[in-house]
């Protein structure tokens, strides 16, 4: 069973992609989800409550849309997943998290998201479903 208390932030400039990621998370049992369409929104949402999100799921396209240093997303989340990471420069790691940090090139699929969330939330049991995927 998914931990219903996990706070998750999805950051993607494309609203339809954010909705697809949210749908994947819902299928895994997660519903405390916020979305951001820019890095500024992600930073504000991640820092305004005084405690970071448990998980940040962010598009590599969004990250390269603004100049940033390696600490620009510090304090936003405890764990992070970057999908479409092929857009990031080699060796550049914008995630400064204490927990799990994962980079995925290309589309985000349910199996990949389930594997990442299993590292973040080890007590959860995830169905082995296929079919939903994000496409660049």
Regions found by a protein language model. Give the residues of each.
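Active-site residues of response regulator receiver
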Residues: 57-61
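Alpha4 helix (beta4-alpha4-beta5 surface) of REC/receiver domains from two-component response regulators
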Residues: 65-69, 76-105
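Acidic, metal-coordinating helix/loop segments flanking the phosphotransfer/catalytic sites
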Residues: 37-55
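Phosphate-coordination loops involved in phosphoryl transfer and adenosine-cofactor binding
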Residues: 3-5
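CheY-like receiver
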Residues: 108-136
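Two-component/phosphorelay signaling modules centered on CheY-like receiver
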Residues: 15-34
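Conserved acidic carboxylate
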Residues: 11-12
């Amino acid at each position: 069973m998914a931990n219903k208390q996990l706070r998750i932030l999805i950051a993607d400039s494309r609203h339809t992609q954010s909705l697809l990621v949210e749908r994947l998370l819902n299928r895994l049992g997660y519903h405390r989800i916020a979305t951001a369409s820019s890095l500024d929104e992600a930073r504000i949402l991640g820092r305004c409550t005084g405690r970071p999100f448990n998980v940040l799921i962010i598009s590599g396209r969004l990250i390269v849309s603004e100049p940033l240093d390696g600490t620009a997303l510090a304090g936003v989340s405890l764990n992070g997943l970057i999908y479409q990471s092929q857009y990031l420069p080699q060796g550049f790691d914008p995630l400064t998290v204490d927990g799990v940090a994962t980079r995925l090139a290309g589309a985000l699929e349910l199996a990949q998201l389930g594997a990442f969330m299993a590292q973040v939330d080890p007590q959860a049991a995830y169905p082995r479903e296929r079919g939903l995927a994000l496409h660049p």
